[in-house]
Amino acid sequence: MERVHTLPDAGEVVFVDASGGMDRHGQRVFLLMCWSPAGGLPLGVIVSTSETEAVVDKAFRLLVGILPDGAFGGRGRRGPLCFMTDDCQAERNALSAVWPEARLLLCTFHVLQAVWRWLHNGKHGIDKQHRQAIMALAKQLVYANNEAEIATTMELVATEWGERYPLLDQYLQGFAARRQEWALCLRTDVPTRGHNTNNIVESAFRVLKDSVLYRTRAFNLLQLFDSVTVQLSKHYARRACDVTNGRQRAALRRSAAAPAKKRAL
């Protein structure tokens, strides 16, 4: 993983997410990934007992302490240009505290999923026949070409639905206030390389669970630590060699299918 930090891509956009269900004690695993011509590559792994802001903040600071001076493509302790995450406030607050110069972006998929869930929450009183039309307007906000289109769409929402659904108007006002985090037209100055979702880190968790842990739970923390450091690094090293030697099909098979027999640790 240390060698991945030498790539220029490591200093651009870093994808961060957490998952669980990998050991019998319920530890949480955080992955920091970057894009590369060979696909997603890991920059760091954190294993913690919880996802509270204090714990995550401490974990990120410990990670900074072991990173090389030229980490994140030579940017060092300043961190990458931006992080892309889902809307986990504790995680985002911790990232902002540890790497204050980095910009925080929201995954487009999770943004729209959150709006969809809000519309389907019965407490908000949105009629079923209106949810799809309102969702289409939310998508217009996210995929707008400029801020003028965002303002026009917000006026349209207020005109058509504001009086009927005051909670919706209030929700979308708060949503629009965070446009710097989710609007695609406002991240053109960031080298996202077309990645506006957290798919890279989501697929990395599939690799970890399928090809490294073989859909089983680690027996204890030591075994989990070995899996997310030594075994995971070996997997990506083999895949990088496959891509370098022109064996892309082998690299894809390696990521998509787990071996039938588990290797002894």
Question: Where do the language-model regions lie?
Answer:
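A broad, low-specificity signal for short, low-complexity segments enriched in glycine/proline
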Residues: 4-7, 44, 167-169, 202
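Active-site beta-loop-alpha junctions of metal-dependent nucleic acid enzymes
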Residues: 23-25, 45-72
